[in-house]
Amino acid sequence: MRDVVLLGSTGSIGTQALDVIAAHPGQFRVCGLGAGGGQIDLLAAQAATFDVPRVAIAADKADEFAHAWSAIAGTKPMPEVACGKDAMAQLAGSLTGTAEESGVVLNGITGSIGLRPTLAALESGATLALANKESLVVGGGLIADAMAWQGQIVPVDSEHSALAQALGAGRHEKGLTSRLVTGRSEVRRLVLTASGGPFRGKSRADLRNVTASQALNHPTWAMGPVVTINSSTLINKGLELIEAALLFDIDPQDITVVVHPQSVVHSMVEFVDGSTIAQASPPDMHLPIALGLSWPDRLDTVARPCAWDTPTAWTFEPYDAEVFPAIGLAREAVAASALHPAVLNAANEVCVEAFLAGRIGYLDIVDTVGRVLESFDGTGQMSLAGVLDADAWARSASHAALGL
């Protein structure tokens, strides 16, 4: 039985992870749940259902949790509850392990606040099932430095899970993320697929008056609001490009993004001999989540497979870089300095929050990110303090640029 700590348990990744765990009794023991605090009743119900001994809440809501627990679980002993800005990182570091045997920390937090828990999990020696792409985008080399053993990170993003699996067709040299990742000399390029979001084929003029409800209507994936907006602007794909470069030690110039509206082929690896290995499955996050929890093993019957005996069509096309400049901004950021990706991410977080609150227009999101990125001078050390300083600068600059 594998010990699991789940961060972001009330979010999209977290709830689906608990679906996987519930569907495979006897294989996992949930040792801790962490959440921001926006859905205390759900968190208490999760803790009661899975007999969780430890709970971490980013907000100061211990009393609210106790009240919810009493209503849901009655006299059942309440788990240990820690609250505050350090609670999630402390929980993330509570498991230990080695390359031969370890528990798993699934980081399903959204945003750069996931960096400290990511570092804590790596330093503890636990396997890190990483859905919090922002950790890699802003943390860069700090992540590699914090790893306790080779292969400690298992990607949970569907694209990076696909790449890790496809890279297994290489020579199985050791790589940063998994026991299978590699064959660097054999790889010509990585191909990240994007659905194209709800605005594929639209012009910039078409996007001028886009509303939040329209942007949240993703054609193929069910995700949280921030990730869904990021997917619509394609900045999510820019962040994933940076993540892939770091995870798999591939030059960003050797990573291509293509639009695949069906969202069945989750990414591909093109080898130097001209062959391409792709990972395909219907769009269902339960699958990469399950693989992250059980890696290198596979769980039985996690999701329905592709219906190979049913007529179907897959299409691939280039994205419109003029309408969707976010991927280009990500390339510029990763080429500029080690701290520019942190600025890119922080500026985007501010802008997406403002858009969802109805305070700015849709096109203002990426336009403002571009202006903030251009104004950053790149000075500062690549350290945790340096990353946090760059993050804070970008947030302040974004608020100023938007007049907020």
Q: Model features per residue range: what roles?
A:
Residues 1-404:
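Catalytic, metal-anchored helix/loop core of enzyme active sites in primary metabolism
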